[in-house]
């Protein structure tokens, strides 16, 4: 059994309105430009998600929307638990990960970065609009 996990940090968000709640911050111009390009890169590499778990924040949902030209009818689930998640929270969210296939999670830092570092055993930074593919072969 091979499971593949794509961990993605949302595209660049706007800080234009300082009164806006963090959860409601939208993507900025660069973020709206980058999301479709990341989708193209992911699909060109054959990283085709069969399930997407996405944070409930506006910027993560807009990131997914910006990738929709490649996602087609890929099922997705909005998960409020991904917003401000710790690595333990993210591991719990991933309990629904496909047993044999590719799951994508679109979230935030520091959670996304810590998750990648924890699962890979290596140090990686995750700027906005970064996606990382992790592979797992085995029974758990």
Kindly label every feature range from the protein language model.
Residues 81-114:
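Mid-chain, well-packed structural core segment of small domains
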Residues 38-41, 89-92, 118-120:
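A generic local structural motif
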Residues 120-140:
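Domain-level recognition of soluble alpha/beta enzyme cores
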Residues 2-85, 112, 123-126:
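Active-site-proximal alpha-helix that buttresses catalytic centers in soluble enzyme cores
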Residues 5, 100-104, 131:
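Residue-level preference for the first positions of well-ordered beta-strands
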Residues 29, 105, 109, 119:
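Short glycine/serine/threonine-biased micro-segments
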């Amino acid at each position: 059994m091979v499971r593949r996990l794509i961990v993605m940090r949302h595209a660049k968000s706007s800080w234009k309105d300082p009164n806006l709640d963090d959860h409601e911050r939208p993507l900025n111009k660069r973020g709206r430009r980058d999301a479709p390009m990341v989708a193209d890169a992911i699909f060109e590499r054959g990283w085709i998600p069969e399930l997407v778990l996405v944070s409930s924040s506006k910027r993560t949902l807009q990131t997914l929307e910006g990738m929709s030209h490649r996602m087609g009818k890929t099922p997705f689930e909005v998960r409020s638990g991904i917003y401000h998640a710790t690595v333990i929270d993210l591991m719990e969210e991933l309990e629904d990960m496909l047993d044999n296939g590719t799951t994508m999670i679109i979230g935030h830092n520091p959670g996304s970065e810590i998750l990648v570092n924890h699962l890979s055993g290596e140090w990686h930074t995750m700027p906005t609009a970064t996606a990382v593919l992790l592979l797992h072969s085995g029974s758990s």
